[in-house]
Structures are given as structure tokens and as C-alpha cells.
Amino acid sequence: MVKQKQVCIIGAGVSGLAAAKAFLARGHHVTVVERSGDLGGVWEPARSYPDVQTQSPKDLYRYTDRGMPRSYPEWPTGPQVHAYLADYARDYGIKRLIRFNTAVLQMNRRPDSIPGWKLDLRGTDSHITQENFDFVVVCTGQFNEPQVISHPGKDTFETQGGRILHSSQYNDAAIAKGRKVVVLGGSKSATDIAVNAVNAGASDVTLVYRRPVWRCPYFIGGLINFKRIFYTRALEAMFRSGSVASLLRFTQAVAKPLVWVSWRGLESLLKLQLKLTKCDMVPDERVEDGVNCSVPIATPGFFPMVADGRIKAIRGSFDHYDGKTIVMTGSERIIADLVVLATGYRIGVPFLPQTFRDNLVDPDGQYRLYRLIANPDLPDLGFVGFNSSFCTVLCADMAANWLVRYADGQLAYQPTKDEMHKIIDMMLHF
């Protein structure tokens, strides 16, 4: 008989909802704390930029027990994803368990050697309370704290009328109209915002990026849905595996020339379709080295806009602001009214004391997590959504269901602490 636990889920995004449902379904008492005023995480309307849509098709960006509505397009928009998540939370009784506008300030082990954690929570009235839980699931994921980079001269730039936003704050296209917009970053959000700014009537749009990366169009060759190529066992077999099985090594060695030709063919097709040579945005690395657990989607319209000059793409980075001018590291100067920092997010668990973080994170920033879910040195604690994958929602769903069984000691094979450390070391080395 499994003891019912008091479980705290930190975060009400994609991963938090999956974790809440998994623990709720197995009879545990669940509390979800969410620091913002709405659920959805990156899909929360206040954090979503205009025209955002999924990179994965709707039949893969979904929970295992609830598909997206048939009326949704192949790649749903931000508002559609948020509606899907809201309906999911309502229908499975999760929304009533969420405490919105509640932040976790700190968590520590419970006193007197009692299993579990004590959390310091700050609610809507700014009052701080302490609550004990038997198990905690961290679902703050990879997109938690905006990574805001500050450059010298920032204050003067803003004093003279310039505006600087993080990409998560670019939620109204009207702010780009008539402005000279500079986007810093090379991610999907950066190219999305650059295209949106052009369509919104910006007088000038510049994208500043460090290096070009391989991107995949929604339809390869204009005909084939990219999932028919990238979401297949055939493509998976083209990557080097962590397995040491003799037969697998032999098979990969025999197929190596064919695999090499296949990758070069894909590179040629992408260069041609996306006009990478004309845009001077051909990546230096091979496509198979750039495509790992994820590959950014080519924003529709981005490369044509670079090719015809509507978007100016400059390789480099900011050095400092000089009045209303951005001075690049190579001394090039760009006049700007609006700067959008598409510089990503910081991955972290700031509410976890440093002593515990030292067990969780290697000096090089890698998380020591078995199956990217649990750390053997941090009992009564799990993580959902800390992996990078083509299928974010499906992975969160599977991780949550594995974690609840791990917490209950009901896995078909419950790994020992030493076994978990061994697998973690192997995966980090790989």
C-alpha cells in the first residue's frame, strides 16, 4: 500500500500540469504553486510574443491522454496552445489546485530528519508562509528566468528615447511600427520577432547573431512535412549511439558512407531552399553536428526577407551603446529605437540552497539527473521538463509518470543510488 504524500509542484507550465496529473491520478494530495497569474509557462499570454507557434506538429506536441483539437492547424499558435493547456487543467481537476501569484523563495530539508522539504512561499498579499511537503517536483524547466544582457551606455540609450526589451516582453507588434528595430540573438524567437517587426511596419530591422545554425523549414523542399524526415527511426539510426553493442557498431560502420551522403544531400537541399548562400548564413558545422535533440524551425519569411534586404543580418555582438547607436564588437554602428534581446533564459533553481545545488549541478553547468528526472543525493525531489527534446510535452508526460512511480517505490526496476550515479556519469561523458 502506497502512502499518500503531500506533493508540491513548482510551476504550472506544460511540465507542471503533467506532474500534477500524474501524482493526482495515483492518490496523492497535490499543491501547484505558480508565481505568475496564469498557467502555461512559456505559453502564458503575457510571456508570448506575437505570431508565436509551435515548432513541433500538433500530433507530437500533446499529452498522451489528450490530443489537440482537430480544428487546430498542424503547428498551433500560442493562444491555441494556451487554450489547450487551460482546458486540460480544467478537465483533469488541476486548475483548482493551482495557487497563482505564489513564489517559492527557498526550500530546505524538513527539520528533525523528517523526510521531505520545507518551502518558504510568498503569496499574493506578499505574506511569507512556511509549508511542509513529503515530495517536491520542480517544473520550472529550461525557460525560467530571462537572460537579460546589459551593455555599457544602456542608460543613456534609454534616456534618449530608446527602448530595450527581452523577447518575453515583446508581446505587442505595435511597438515596432515606424521604429528602427535591432534584435540580438539567433534563436527561433529572434527570427520570429524580426519577421514580425517587418510585417508590423518597422522602418528598419536588423538581426545581430553570433553564428549561423542549421534550420529546418516546416516543409522540406516545399513538399514534405519535416516530421516525415526528422521524426523517424531512420534518422535516429544516422546518429552515433551511446550503446556499445557490437552489432550496432558494425551496422553503423557499414552504413557510414550512405549516412554521410544522406547528410550532404540534406545540407544541399537546405542551402538551396532557404537561400543560405545568398544570405551569407551557411553554418560552419555539418548538419549532423548541429542537429542534436532539437533543431530550430526556419521562421516562414525570414530568409526571403534577409535575401531581399528587408532584414539586415549581421554576424557579431553588441559592444556598447553610444547615444541612440549600437556599437558592435567589430566597430560597426547601428542606429536603433527599439532593441529586443532574444538572449534566452537562465536555467536554474535559485530557491534551492547552494549546498544542494552543488550536488545537482556540475561545475560546467550540467545537471546530474538520472533520466533527467532525479538526483540520487536529493531524496524526495524530482524534476520534470529539464530535458531538451523534439517532443517536449510527450517527454514531460512520460517523465512525470516515471517520477511518481519512482517516488512511490513502484518501478518495475527501482534503481539503486550507485546505479543512478553510474548512468548519470555515463550520459554526461557521452
Task: Report the location of each language-model feature.
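Alpha/beta-hydrolase-fold enzymes
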Residues: 231-260
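Mid-to-C-terminal Rossmann-like scaffold of FAD/NAD(P)H-dependent oxidoreductases
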Residues: 418-430
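N-terminal glycine-rich dinucleotide-binding loop that anchors FAD/FMN and/or NAD(P) in oxidoreductases
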Residues: 47-70, 226-238
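Flavin (primarily FAD) cofactor-binding/catalytic cores of flavoenzymes
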Residues: 2-51, 55, 67-221, 256-420
